[in-house]
């Protein structure tokens, strides 16, 4: 099995998480699977939902999730597509015309007030939490992701249906601390990453922790290999100390959440949640992942105030 297929297979077997995260991934796969179009039939316009994938496991995940999450029947079909390289087997998830409009509205792909297609990703996903953002990227990669072989120059690309969707995906990547670029190849709009460390982090955040080790471990650049696996190798003393400090910070933040419950200002809660979601991020990377972005000093200050608040609450409780 090719490494790209292994990545998509691993992502397809991840527990979908909360309904909000599953919805984010379903919506992303419908967009990047290019399965949404309007068709004029007689006197009415029908919505056809039939995304196609090169991975049968990805298509099967989408079929099962549409049926379980939205209670809408979906059929899995194989389709032979003619390409310049010859015939290619694809896998389509067919929702059918009757349920297509309902699914499009519920996933935010169409504005029911204007009966108009939303060209970029829906706003509720762009403004969603970190878990939803990861779900969007996971769905995009499962649908239209390309990954270079380990012996080739590092590259990860997402083939996008339009400019607006590419812009939305890039903005979401920034919230994960990932900087991606947009470019066009033969009229195809793509979101592109070339930094091997960024690719390794993104694949890990999407959930491909096993296959990303294969991708990184087979790279001929030994220095890049060790850098990309800094948390697993612990050969360098500075890296070991940084990883230990980050792990301790996660434990302290989680304890503060348990102590304070709902009595936490939103800005302090958001900073603490960023540390829990990204235990291997530097303070600068956490600041870039915040929305809106903040400085590393602001992140450090908010986490410090959160811990101080929890410590004071424990002291007050002990004296009561």
Curated annotation (Swiss-Prot):
Keyword Iron-sulfur: no
Gene Ontology terms for molecular function: DNA binding
Residue spans binding DNA: 282-315
Coiled coil: none
Keyword Nucleotide-binding on entry: no
Record's keyword terms, sorted: Cell cycle, Cell division, DNA-binding
Source organism superkingdom: Bacteria
Gene3D superfamilies in the record: Homing endonucleases
GO biological process annotation, one example: cell division
Pfam families per UniProt: HTH_WhiA, LAGLIDADG_WhiA
PANTHER family tied to this protein: CELL DIVISION PROTEIN WHIA-RELATED
Free-text function comment from the UniProt entry: Involved in cell division and chromosome segregation.
UniProt similarity note: Belongs to the WhiA family.
Protein name (record): Probable cell division protein WhiA
Species this chain originates from: Bifidobacterium animalis subsp. lactis (strain AD011)
Gene: whiA
